[in-house]
Amino acid sequence: AFSNAELAREIYLRQNFGIANAEEILLPGTNAKMNEFQALMGLLNLKYVEQEINNRKKKVELYRHYLSKIPGIKLLPNSEKIKQNYAYFPIVVTEEYGMTRDELAVKLQKHNIFPRKYFYPLITDFTCYRGRYRGDTPNARYIADRVLCLPIWGGIENIDIELICEILELKV
């Protein structure tokens, strides 16, 4: 639809948060990927939101049961003051675990399990912002290098969660 390939790429990037690939954001962007039909489908599915949240909560409880026993895998604390939607299940991979977050991600991918690195790279490391902020952010850097979000959705089977946790526990 565009005769100018460079402009087409820029428009695509801007409508997808400026994301070029899993670890590089080239320019500021927004989330503009939904068309009218997709918006309609979203509206029609709103009646299922609470059911999905409840299903995800049960899956998170199962993850927490297994992962709480693994040294070097830190879980975010539960808080009764926060109502969660369980959209993500982040873990923090510490040095005590014996491998880095990146090594663990590769290991899971070898088993066809695709976790996501969240908060990575730091915004200050994005190509479009690099060099604009001069302060030190050690807490943000620590989290950016260690957070991994494990697969979570209401329909994930318990056996799949158990397999993921077994892979994390075995460290092979």
Feature names for model-found ranges:
Residues 3-172:
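PLP-dependent aminotransferase class I/II
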